[in-house]
Regions:
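Extracellular/lumenal ectodomain signal focusing on beta-strand-rich modules
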Residues: 47, 102-105
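Acidic/histidine-enriched, beta-strand-rich ligand/metal-binding domains
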Residues: 46, 55, 91-94
């Protein structure tokens, strides 16, 4: 997207870092992606979201690649891990991640 900018934001309290995609033509936040820097040199890749009107335009990939390049430049020697949906798995495998156990979400209202 021509009018898209990505801003990097860090938090002090929770060790979270995020990137936000902004459509400059209307100042709308159209996507975000997070990571959590943990103890013992680990980083957990967290959720990502893209506004429904902006999906299928490469914004998720752009956010993911921006975060990935940042990690490669700033966290050499860290172990990166993620819990991901089936739709995100091909990108993680493309980047050299190895799959672990399959986990199934369950819930019950009581």
């Amino acid at each position: 997207m021509e009018n898209l900018t990505i801003s990097h934001i860090t938090t002090n309290a929770q060790n979270l870092e995020m990137w936000v995609a902004i459509d400059q033509s209307n100042s709308l936040a159209v996507g975000h992606i997070f990571m959590n820097v943990e103890k013992d040199n680990k980083i957990k890749f967290l959720d990502a979201w893209v506004h429904s009107d902006y999906r299928r335009q490469g914004i998720y990939r752009l956010l993911w690649e921006t975060r990935w390049e940042y990690v490669l430049e700033n966290y050499k020697g860290y172990t990166i891990y993620a819990w991901c949906k089936e739709t995100s798995l091909p990108l993680l495998i493309e980047k050299g991640f190895e799959t672990g156990e399959i986990v199934t979400y369950v819930e019950k209202k009581i």
